[in-house]
């Protein structure tokens, strides 16, 4: 593709000479592992100047130890607005007179539990990170993106299209973020800023293990009646989801490739389905009547399909 730099992206040498076009720059949140880290490495290897945002100093050190040029780490905590503002100021200083060509909002968290037993504080935390924290990042970095007429790429989920049992917290937060993305896309269109949504299916990442690894702790806090009603079903859904991710999920590098496409395409799509099963799942959600989709989901997870019978 042909890349047209923003007017502020050229720099004159100290003595008369040819114009130098700086590398394109991008901020990737949640860069310590999984999709975020794969995207950081892919873009850096293709010459981008990559700002890899992580929560902890140890995570920054681990990225630096990978020894890949073009990567600059920055500390950014989606749950802390001051941290986000500080990161924005730091990156603005590092960029100098240049803007930010790309923003990939990738960081997020998951939670599996029946709606009846969702701890309100934990549900709020999921939305704080997956929705409000993402909005904080967009608001903090949009002036830099606007300066470069860059792009905003948001990481959603194929669960935007359907909600598995016990995934209400994650799916609802991702659906909310998809709506925010759609509104932002329309609002920034006249400003020449593309906004895209990536919708991965099952991906083999540490985030899946982290979500599933704490299930027994979650179950242990339920009242006895809830354990009888939900515990075995939740374990079954979790085990199938883990197996799907572990054995049939796409590598994070496959999603990173789609992110790069969204950043570089001349006319990027509004949404990109990413991964082995994302297209199939989205098409099923689009085509099947909701009651049939419910039955298909229940059968996939081996749960009872007869109404009123467990």
Region spans (language model):
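Conserved glycine-rich cofactor-binding loop
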Residues: 32-33
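C-terminal beta-strand-loop-alpha-helix "lid" module of Rossmann-like NAD(P)-dependent dehydrogenases
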Residues: 190-245
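Active-site loop immediately N-terminal to the catalytic Tyr-X3-Lys motif
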Residues: 116, 162-169
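The beta1-alpha1 cofactor-binding region of Rossmann-like NAD(H)/NADP(H)-dependent oxidoreductases
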Residues: 76-89, 120
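Substrate-binding pocket helix/loop in short-chain dehydrogenase/reductase
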Residues: 114-115, 122-124
